[in-house]
Amino acid sequence: MNDSISSGVTRFTLWSALFFLALATSASMAQTQAPKGAQTFDSVLNPNASEQAQRQQQQPGNNAPVWRDVRSEKEHFTSTRGVEAGVLMQSGGETWRQQRNNQLIPLGGLLLAGVLGACALFFMWRGTMRLKERPTGRRMQRFNVFERSMHWTVAITFSTLAVSGLVMLFGKIVLLPVIGHTLFAWLTMLCKNLHNFVGPVFSLAVIVLFFTFLRDNWPKIQDMVWMRKAGGLFSDQHVPSGRFNAGEKIWFWVGLLGLGVTVSASGLVLNFPNFEQGRAAMQLANIVHVAATVLMMCMAAGHIYMGTVGVEGAFDAMKTGYVDEAWAKEHHQDWYDEYKRGAAAAPVAAGTGPIPAGAPQAREKNA
């Protein structure tokens, strides 16, 4: 019994060895005796496979044909479904990286630093521009509650996006060496999520704010005079203007509308990558987004400077909605005259009661 079992095991082992030997011999003969010009499975799947095999024999370690095929951006096979999911490597990504790191970041940083430096130098030279006349104590409504609410919505969301964007754009250069990798990674992730959620709110607020102030921002002839004299910033010369001067109108049309819409549109392309846009479109959107944002921050720096420490009483207009008559007469003479004639369209503050017959359309408020 034991002899028969031992004999069977021996025969099985012998036949198994012969089978694997024959299989290996056939594979070797098939590889060495393949007809000239015949394509192997690998060469059919990857046309550069034979080229890579030859390159490995001539220059071991040189896998240039493989990477040439990878960088060709040809669509191959993947179980993932999506735009460009079959493209292993997109060559435009390196071009985008070089433009972002070697052009946008250095130039944007220099431009922002230059504008902030110019504001600081101007303040050191000119200081806060005080009223030439004493305040009268009679206050005029310049902005109603809705106008101020929309302005502050845009201001707060813009400031949030600006700070978070600056961290993501310049943080690797400025913050990382100071706070270390762990804290910087946490801060950058927080800024990215904050940026993504606040961005759409800013976009909507920009549109509402544009139509809120559109009526009083149409260009007029006297705006050319204001621009020629630079609003009296360098000469102390009185230059009349309407409810908004030419400088504020430039900020409205170029900064709020032009750059604001550009930043919003490009940001939405980046924020929602599930609308069939490819990587090339998102790389272009990123370049446009960064460039437009830097320009908008530069213009906003001038706007914020003039509205806070640059001009006395300007911040009160957006804080309380009211300005002194002396301020209105000195900075917006034409609007003041219309106001006093009862032709201004400034609404009455809520809760002040009906306007008496014959009174100006915009009500005054005693300090």
Positions of the model-derived regions?
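Hydrophobic secretory-pathway targeting helix
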Residues: 1-32
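Membrane-embedded alpha-helical bundles that constitute the cytochrome b-like, heme-associated redox core
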Residues: 2-5, 29-367
